[in-house]
Amino acid sequence: MQGYTRWVLQAAIAASFASSCAYAQETIKIGHVAATSGAIAHLGKDNENGARMAVDEINAKGLTIGGKRYRLVLQAEDDAGDPKQGTTVAQKLVDAKVNGVIGHENSGTSIPASKIYFDAGIPQISPSASNPKYTRQGFNTAFRNVANDEQLGAALARYAVQVGKARQIAVIDDRTAYGKGLADEFIKNIKGSSARIVSQQYTTDRASDFGAILTTIKASKPDLIFFGGMDAVAGPMLKQMKQLGIKANFMGGDGMCSDSVPKLAGDGLADGQVICAEAGGVEPQQQKALDDFRAAYQRKFGVEVLTYAPYAYDALLTMVDAMQQAGSPDPAKYLPVLARIRHKGVTGTVAFDARGDVQNGVLTIYTFRGGKRQRLTVMK
């Protein structure tokens, strides 16, 4: 009897060990990287929430790939928007043997990190990095599901001149890969138009005092100030513009196109004064799916979507769709499928060109009224 009991116990332990091993083999680890600390932590958390929402939904429904059942695990990391920390985190994810990465959040961290993922053969989809260089380094593992700065800068310049009737434009950029890249594209597209650049100034992504550059700009009498940078800087800048009596309109890209701008600007923001563009958007026929996502997001997290949560959500679902079509979560096997995929998401159909840029990317132009973001139009 004791021998039988011992045998049963050993069998149970062996079964438990086998079950544990099987569970480990059935786990797919997806990395997510954004700045979840620092000045743009609110935007980073927005991205992370979008990815986490996708993971939770997939796990709730059950995931089968190649006839095997899997469970997704999101390994969320913080790069603080710092390129050096971004590469450190990227190597950490490679060492953790993640099956794919959603991120990084901004261009300054996505670009250096992309080399590390490429060397490891790990697919990476950024839901928000817009600098063209990110997908032009020859790395077949780098993708993005938002428009790039060439598209964004061109659309904003066109809107500024044709709709906003701007004629004298001052430009400020924060010297980051994102801010400088966007400002350069905007300036390039203004040249040859009926408008002209009357002043070009520089700041940093951590600055809080803009008195000197705004005083210089005021003397040039612009009717529009274009800012290449993030909302954490744009808000205080708008407040100081009012203090100096600068009544120009204010324009920027996706980095300053969140509901945080009115909060940071306070009474420095007039209704309709700010025009910004999100490097993504949906056609009217796709609006319901996006609205449903926003409602579900608010129910889950208790806050509204800021900017790129739906793109992080779609990026993760697109990656998993590629795994399912390939019949394997092995990066080497699903990467070729990801490159040619067409995934119907809440932000529209996600498909990539030969460089890894999203095909047929649209942009959404917004303003702010009553402290809330208001959509004006969708552009290509």
Predicted region positions:
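Extracytosolic ligand-binding ectodomains
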Residues: 2-11, 23-380
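N-terminal signal peptide c-region/cleavage motif recognized by signal peptidases
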Residues: 19-21
